[in-house]
């Protein structure tokens, strides 16, 4: 029962048999097109976003299992705002403004994969990601928003 795990990042709903998937899965003896179809079916909700996927191949039986992870926080922020990409100059140009309600929604989606113990801490991690994407939070810079969270200004969202 030899198991091999292949971890890749694919665009939701658009995996192909080409690199990086094909060369990684091909030598393991499973039908690549079946793997691609399953990945595309499981990631269709994340269309256009980068999604971490784990393909677990049972090499002796030539069977496989596909586990789909949650997209990076930056991709979820861009999806919530309908942005193609973040700011090219994050500290100088603002790409958008996100509400605390959407920050909390993203934090709830990502909380299991984060190191944060509380929803408030998870939200602060997501706000930190807003720095690199170039997105303001409730009209404030991400650093100001984190201070406001610490000060209790947004506590109503965490109850």
Curated annotation (Swiss-Prot):
It holds the Pfam family Ribosomal_L11_N. Transmembrane segments: none annotated. GO terms for molecular function: large ribosomal subunit rRNA binding; structural constituent of ribosome. Keywords: Ribonucleoprotein, Ribosomal protein, RNA-binding, rRNA-binding. One of its GO terms (biological process) is translation. One of its GO terms (cellular component) is large ribosomal subunit. Belongs to the universal ribosomal protein uL11 family. Part of the ribosomal stalk of the 50S ribosomal subunit. Interacts with L10 and the large rRNA to form the base of the stalk. L10 forms an elongated spine to which L12 dimers bind in a sequential fashion forming a multimeric L10(L12)X complex. NCBIfam families: PRK01143.1. Forms part of the ribosomal stalk which helps the ribosome interact with GTP-bound translation factors. This is Large ribosomal subunit protein uL11.
């Amino acid at each position: 029962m030899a198991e091999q795990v292949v971890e890749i990042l694919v665009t939701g709903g658009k995996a192909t048999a080409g690199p990086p998937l094909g060369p990684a899965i091909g030598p393991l003896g499973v039908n690549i097109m079946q793997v691609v179809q399953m990945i595309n079916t499981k990631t269709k909700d994340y269309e256009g976003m980068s999604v971490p996927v784990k393909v677990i191949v049972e090499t002796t039986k030539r069977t496989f299992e596909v586990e789909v992870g949650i997209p990076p926080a930056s991709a979820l922020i861009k999806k919530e705002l309908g942005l193609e990409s973040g700011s090219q100059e994050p500290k100088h140009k603002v790409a958008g403004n996100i509400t605390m309600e959407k920050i909390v929604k993203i934090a709830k989606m990502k909380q299991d994969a984060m190191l944060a113990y509380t929803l408030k801490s998870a939200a602060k991690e997501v706000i930190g990601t807003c720095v690199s994407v170039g997105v303001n939070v409730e009209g404030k810079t991400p650093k100001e928003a984190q201070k406001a969270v610490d000060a209790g200004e947004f506590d109503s969202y965490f109850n």
